[in-house]
Amino acid sequence: MKYVKSIFAALLFTVVLSIGAFAQSAPKVIAVVNQADWCSVCKGNGQRALGAFMENNKDGEISLVVNDVTDAETKKKSAFELQKLGIIKAMKNYEATGVIYFFDAKTKKPITQITVANSDEEIAYVISKVKRAVR
């Protein structure tokens, strides 16, 4: 059952990434969520937080990338995506799991961060604040 849930979660994240890629070719903000299969905060809050993120990012201004740090293999796959976006160096300072880190897409500088354990309202507030910061 855990394997099925992991497959489902991976599929959901892939769909979210694909939607973000088609919604806007040049996002103003890159959001990176560090997650791992062993992270209890991620397991308990990840799907709810992802739903809150999607609900508040219908315009696609923020591109979401999942940085899966479960093991060496998932880290390698995630590193490829981070490298494509030019934020792999910036992410070296942000390694905590269960956290969404927001970066300016042009400068690659950090804007803010929030844990996936925060409420939907707090996540919505941070997303609106981030969008205003890059306008």
Task: Please identify what each model-predicted range represents.
Residues 9-18:
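Bacterial N-terminal signal peptides
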Residues 78-106:
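Short, internal strand/loop/helix patches
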